[in-house]
Amino acid sequence: MMAVAAAQKNREMFAIKKSYSIENGYPSRRRSLVDDARFETLVVKQTKQTVLEEARSKANDDSLEDCIVQAQEHIPSEQDVELQDEHANLENLPLEEYVPVEEDVEFESVEQEQSESQSQEPEGNQQPTKNDYGLTEDEILLANAASESSDAEAAMQSAALVVRLKEGISSLGRILKAIETFHGTVQHVESRQSRVEGVDHDVLIKLDMTRGNLLQLIRSLRQSGSFSSMNLMADNNLNVKAPWFPKHASELDNCNHLMTKYEPDLDMNHPGFADKVYRQRRKEIAEIAFAYKYGDPIPFIDYSDVEVKTWRSVFKTVQDLAPKHACAEYRAAFQKLQDEQIFVETRLPQLQEMSDFLRKNTGFSLRPAAGLLTARDFLASLAFRIFQSTQYVRHVNSPYHTPEPDSIHELLGHMPLLADPSFAQFSQEIGLASLGASDEEIEKLSTVYWFTVEFGLCKEHGQIKAYGAGLLSSYGELLHAISDKCEHRAFEPASTAVQPYQDQEYQPIYYVAESFEDAKDKFRRWVSTMSRPFEVRFNPHTERVEVLDSVDKLETLVHQMNTEILHLTNAISKLRRPF
């Protein structure tokens, strides 16, 4: 489908290619999911604006050049003169004898309306003015996809358009006439009354057409005052401008590996900045993660004595503090990991054995990461019950603090709670909510993740306990978080999502959940207010995320639920039988 190619091109065009550094506008020296999301939103906006401006400028230049060439090359021939004379004679005929042929596509002039709407368009996606050759974001993405090859541009392919009609369903005839003019074939038409103010009907049109003709169709329809907006759709009825997200666990291989320097090389304040051996070690482990593909066994890391020493120092501290300050779910999982000889102070656990443990308990698994994922891609992984984990170890000179997540933070902070069913479900809910979310919503989700999964507190028998990985792997902030030196607020996703975050010192505010179940319920209600126009679910049997965008898919899901309910009903009946 041509729109799929356009959607893929969208992801390539707006990939993060800047180093995550202060020099490029990164908001702090310490890497965090929240700052990553903010930085990525800024860079994507800047990149999108630049790409669109360049494409529009090129289109304007090409159009002007074509006009000049045509003017220079067109010298009236005798045949042209004869045709002009014939046309003049026709115009002099009486009205009843001459009826002009209607244009294939006739649209009203709406220069004033376009001018008014431009001020409301987001930056980088403005409608073109009358002096602009005029390329919308849809057209630029489609044009880039079509430019892959001449065969692709000329081949007849399928597309889907959603057009919003301002003047009623009668405008549909003009759309169908335009499609016929550009040699398209309509396969499906569906309309409904619009929920958007000022719009009468929404119309979905599925058609077959070449990419070149589709571009011309979009440009023609866009100029009509009868249509409020028009969107080119990709698979699953998603707008091609919507952020790409993986549909299967294997597609996590396509997540953006950021083009950035390694943190020890970047920051003079990094504990390993002056240690060449440590910097080389970090680079080697990062390259292992870069080479990993879906289905591969997680590479074995032969940790050095120095790295094991660092692990031992942090492990013993957590072992001492957890019984008193960690939540019950964390303590139970920690004990289970010790019983299975995965958590021992004499060696670092390998990600493969930890992944096997999690899969057995909650269905979560691990995937090695270089620590260089976008916030969007990291959250997307959680939707598949996959946690992207680093394998490098913090510098030995700073065992109780690291400027970025390392394997000790992942192992001691995140892994135990990912073995708890309720917390694992909460983590996956955050991941599912991120799929197809806007950049601004990714910022909010990252902030919620930060104040819960990383620095969250919960109530337990009237006392405050920690469940955040950042707290459980950093005893200094753990003691601060449970003290009276900071403010404790009840967890409410709407307010948590906009809470400012700072990384220069310990947080002044922490959010306290009544329980994981309560946190999940509140989170689900908040997610339902997000702008994403579709719902998704994870199918654990196929490791695939399904977009619930059709009656057929909903019917299939209902049948599956009925089967599960039947099993539950049978189980209850058997339990009620007398011995």
Curated annotation (Swiss-Prot):
Residues 105-114 have a biased composition (Acidic residues). Keywords: Catecholamine biosynthesis, Cell projection, Cytoplasm, Iron, Metal-binding, Monooxygenase, Neurotransmitter biosynthesis, Oxidoreductase. Residues 105-132 are annotated as: Disordered. One of its GO terms (molecular function) is tyrosine 3-monooxygenase activity. Fe cation binds at H409, H414, E454. Phosphorylation leads to an increase in the catalytic activity. GO terms for biological process: adult chitin-containing cuticle pigmentation; adult locomotory behavior; catecholamine metabolic process; courtship behavior; cuticle pigmentation; developmental pigmentation; dopamine biosynthetic process; dopamine biosynthetic process from tyrosine. It comes from the Eukaryota. Its EC number is 1.14.16.2. Pathway: Catecholamine biosynthesis; dopamine biosynthesis; dopamine from L-tyrosine: step 1/2. It is found in: Cytoplasm, Perinuclear region; Cell projection, Axon. PROSITE patterns: BH4_AAA_HYDROXYL_1, BH4_AAA_HYDROXYL_2. Its main location: cytoplasm. Its cofactor is Fe(2+). One of its GO terms (cellular component) is perikaryon. It catalyses: (6R)-L-erythro-5,6,7,8-tetrahydrobiopterin + L-tyrosine + O2 = (4aS,6R)-4a-hydroxy-L-erythro-5,6,7,8-tetrahydrobiopterin + L-dopa. Belongs to the biopterin-dependent aromatic amino acid hydroxylase family. Plays an important role in the physiology of adrenergic neurons. This is Tyrosine 3-monooxygenase.
